[in-house]
């Protein structure tokens, strides 16, 4: 599957959708910033085009992807081309105040590998650092979860919590219904409407199909 990734993702979103996605992410980061310590480094695993990391406020911004995304990520961001599972070998351990992952864990091969990845995240975090995970929830998405050929592992909020606990990430926040399933779905792409959605929690219960998890690496 790795050799197909560039072709797969290039065909999944056209340039108009990429631009709209960036506008959506600016508003999502506005919401998520409350969980991020701006006085510490942030790492975005599986960063794609850097939709999250380009907007977050932090002393240092790092991004990683198995693909070479340097041309898409702003030059002031430290980009590392590596598998998420090997990051402990190539970036500082115990260094980051926040490690972020979005729509990433479902692409891993097995549930054991999901736990291994979360243990790597725990290893990269400084004491008190936080993992922020946005994750499609198969219980809420249903069969559409498998509409993407590269989805391999099915997770609910409960299995995500269990995996995080096994990785010694202690739950700070769990929002089972947060965002719609994808930017191809029902989340508006106008920035003002996205922010209105994020401020109006009853809408999450109607449209939310992705779970937000925030976990802490305690000393």
Give short role names for the model-derived ranges.
Residues 1-94, 98-102, 112-118, 211:
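Conserved N-terminal segment of class I S-adenosyl-L-methionine
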